[in-house]
Amino acid sequence: MQFFIIGTDTNVGKTIVSSWLCLHTAYDYFKMIQTGSINGTDSDILKKLTYSKIHKEAYCYKEPLSPHLAAKLEQDEININNIILPNASNLVIEGAGGLLVPINQQYLLLDIISYLMLPVILVTHSRLGTINHTLLTLQALKSKGIEVVGVIVNGKPNQDNCDAITWYGKTTILAQFPFLSTITKTTLRNIPLTQELKQLFIV
């Protein structure tokens, strides 16, 4: 299976959740578009936290900006026809920023996901505002006919928020991923996959 991991925003925990999933499932990892490489890449993080095969990014830019701006600074433009998925049966693909982040002058990240038509796992935060952010993202995905297999909520557990997202978003909470003060292979390994995730990833 191949799953697209996207977030309701930047810095909601896509990379840590991707690391957790890859560590437990041995899935390959592919960061489609990387910005901010001057500060290190998400692929570098996966190399430290997992044993997975890491595939080279389709596009990688230095500045931590929206992909269309980061590319422009380097006199480049992202061509979605050049984004070719790795030949891997079991693959976690991580998006860049939020769903409506511009990729170039024509396309948003949503358009790429719609073109690929892969099932999506949505990562969101547990703090105030998550219900609105998550429901808007779910609505945008569903408007394009994209399959959302469920939501992973990252941060301090908040069952009320999870219940609201489940009810109004007509979706499934696949896991509540806890806040970790230290992130290592060991701390990630100590958080077991939920039964829902085991069934999805067939582990």
Curated annotation (Swiss-Prot):
Cofactor list: Mg(2+)
Enzyme Commission identifier(s): 6.3.3.3
Catalytic residue list: 31
InterPro entries in the record: DTB_synth_BioD (IPR004472), P-loop_NTPase (IPR027417)
Catalytic activity, reaction form: (7R,8S)-7,8-diammoniononanoate + CO2 + ATP = (4R,5S)-dethiobiotin + ADP + phosphate + 3 H(+)
List of residues binding substrate: 35
Gene Ontology MF terms in the entry: ATP binding; dethiobiotin synthase activity; magnesium ion binding
Enzyme class per UniProt: ligase
Pfam families, per database record: AAA_26
Pathway entry: Cofactor biosynthesis; biotin biosynthesis; biotin from 7,8-diaminononanoate: step 1/2
Key words, A-Z: ATP-binding, Biotin biosynthesis, Cytoplasm, Ligase, Magnesium, Metal-binding, Nucleotide-binding
Residues involved in ATP binding: 11-16, 42, 94-97
Domain of life of the native organism: Bacteria
Keyword flag ATP-binding: yes
One example of a Gene Ontology biological process annotation: biotin biosynthetic process
Cellular compartment(s): Cytoplasm
UniProt cross-references to NCBIfam families, sorted A to Z: bioD
Subunit-level organization: Homodimer.
Family under the similarity heading: Belongs to the dethiobiotin synthetase family.
Name of the protein in its database record: ATP-dependent dethiobiotin synthetase BioD
Organism expressing this protein natively: Lawsonia intracellularis (strain PHE/MN1-00)
